[in-house]
Regions:
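Conserved AdoMet/S-adenosylmethionine-binding subsite of the radical SAM
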Residues: 119-268
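N-terminal pre-triad scaffold of radical SAM enzymes
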Residues: 21-58, 98-101, 107-111
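Short acidic-hydrophobic sequence patches enriched in Asp/Glu that either
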Residues: 67, 197, 274
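Conserved Radical SAM active-site core
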Residues: 54-171
Length: 301
């Protein structure tokens, strides 16, 4: 694990070490708006109940395994090294009178990695370790750094997971980015590559969101001959509007396109103009902020 080079980095590269086994990996994230510290619960293999065609995690196997004490050590090592570098640079600035060196603040600690985090038996322990690291190094929940979970939303059907998430939302201000790729069973099946039931997934998302706030994230890209269009986006907007009308707390919607390679090379990103067109349909139908992310970053509406 290494610190990202200051002034370098790309949203198209979210590497997790040479063999994909790093537990802690700094990346530049479009949706975080800067430096995000990723946490990977699957250093040995990809583990997910979806097979999203756009997924950038290539199949692999490695010798590593997840251990909670190792995650704690890796987070502490990363933040200690970062603090040492920052102190050295501040000393240099004091000696030279310079103050123009770039320094990227940590926008979030994000639990994501090589699969679906809620499937891991270490999920709860990992969240607790991340929250502790944020308190130790970044000022806790009031320090300006989010604690984020990226999930495919299937865990919302499990009472143990929802109870844990609700507790983390209340105690640690956990921000949940919940995937909802589609507005009908066919669209959902194409984007998830799974047989998981669409209606049940939507119902479990809504059930949780009626109790705790979430962010909805939706991938928009070409998959073979399939491409989202304004008609489909109208159904998507109607779906979200219905959830909101029944009391779901959706903080905002993230519409984003593909930015990194996928193993099957079946997917292609949508251009900025097309993304804005589709986002306009959603914005007109829901009463929450809609943020739009192209290949290179956020697109102002």
């Amino acid at each position: 694990m290494t610190l990202p080079r200051e002034g370098k980095g790309s949203v198209s590269e979210h590497g997790r070490g040479d063999d994909g086994s790093d537990l802690v990996y700094p990346v530049f994230s479009r949706r975080s708006g800067g430096l995000s510290i990723g946490v990977n619960l699957y250093p040995d293999r990809k583990t997910c109940n979806f097979a999203c065609p756009y997924c950038e995690v290539f199949p692999f196997s490695g010798p590593g395994r997840f251990e909670t004490p190792t995650l704690k050590r890796e987070l502490d090592r990363y933040f200690a090294a970062r603090a040492d570098i920052r102190a050295a640079r501040a000393e240099m600035d004091a000696e030279t009178g310079a103050n123009d060196r770039a320094w990227f603040p940590v926008r979030d600690i994000c639990v994501s990695g090589n699969g679906e985090p809620t499937l891991s038996p270490h999920f709860g322990e990992a969240l607790a370790v991340c929250a502790e690291a944020r308190r130790t190094w970044l000022g806790g929940s009031d320090g300006g750094t989010d604690l984020v979970l990226i999930t495919n939303s299937t865990g919302f059907s499990q009472p143990g997971i929802t109870a844990l998430l609700a507790r983390m939302v209340h105690d640690e201000r956990l921000v949940i980015w919940a995937k909802l790729d589609g507005a009908d069973p066919d669209w959902f099946a194409i984007m998830s590559g799974s047989q998981i039931d669409f209606a049940s997934t939507v119902a479990s998302i809504e059930s949780f969101a009626r109790r705790e706030p979430i962010v909805i994230q939706t991938m928009l890209c070409r998959v073979g001959d399939f491409e989202p269009d304004p008609e489909r986006m109208k159904r998507y907007a109607d779906l979200l509007a219905g959830m909101l009308s029944r009391g779901a707390h959706i903080r905002e919607v993230h519409l984003y396109t593909k930015a990194r390679p996928d193993p099957g090379d079946r997917c292609a990103p949508l251009g900025d103009a097309r993304m804005l067109e589709l986002a306009g349909v959603v914005s007109a139908g829901v009463g929450v902020p809609v943020r739009v992310f192209g290949e290179s970053g956020e697109i102002p509406e």
